Amino acid sequence: MDLGLKGKVAVVTGGSKGIGYATAEAFLKEGASVAICSRKKEELEEAKGALEKFGPIYAEVVDVSKGEENYHFAEQVFQHFGRLDIWVNNVGTTGYKKGEEYDEEEINLMVDTCFKSVVYGCQAAFRYMKKSGGAIVNVSSLAARCSSAGRSTLYGPLKSAINNLTNTFAGEYCAHNVRVCCIMPGFTATPLAKAAIPEEELKKNAMGTLLRRMAEPEEIAKPIVFLASDAASYMTATTIEVSGGRSMTLNPSFAYERLKENLE
């Protein structure tokens, strides 16, 4: 299937590793030009070097929790490529704590990184899409639907806010032919997850899916690219869960074992 991405320009925030890197690579392989950003210069340069073999890539150090840096990044991308068609808001952080353990600085960090960055990214993208149309994809989380109580108390509520924000911006931008969609990944084998969540808990969560494993970043990237493409031209204010069936049954492990018994 031709996704209609050849010649288009896609921005992927947090594109130096994990889901962001996989998404940037997927866009490039579909013929798009890609701009990535990260706060960490060394990681960004390494990612840019690895991605160059797939197609045109632009990289810039950006703190997406700051509005002006988003706006400047969008301007630089537009000047570099001459257009801006797609924006993927991918940056996030977890904060592995109970609610009572967060101090004011940590709360602000969570809000700035997980929520404000998405607001600013949508604003920055819209400045360049309102005349020619485009697509925005926000990366939320399964935690938006399932409580993360006792593990990362603020993460789920902030991701829920992204889901609502997606629908709100979809309504505000629709007259300009700008679509806004959202993806809710389940547990994914990213550097962020591995650093924030103990290995034993990661294993338990993987076994709690119908597919009995964590997702690979590439398995999240493909739906993101689809939502941003012309193949999804009638989709907006849409949130897609990609979780290996984690939220579809009360006891995924039990369902898996019973089905396995029947097959045997």
Question: Which residues does each PLM region occupy?
Answer:
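Conserved glycine-rich cofactor-binding loop
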Residues: 9, 16-18
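The beta1-alpha1 cofactor-binding region of Rossmann-like NAD(H)/NADP(H)-dependent oxidoreductases
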Residues: 61-73, 104, 218-219
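Substrate-binding pocket helix/loop in short-chain dehydrogenase/reductase
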Residues: 98-111, 205
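Active-site helix of classical SDR
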Residues: 122, 158, 166
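Alpha-helical segment proximal to the catalytic Tyr-Lys
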Residues: 127, 171-175, 233
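Residue(s) in the substrate-gating loop at a strand-loop-helix junction
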Residues: 141
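Short C-terminal tail/terminal secondary-structure segment
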Residues: 236-264
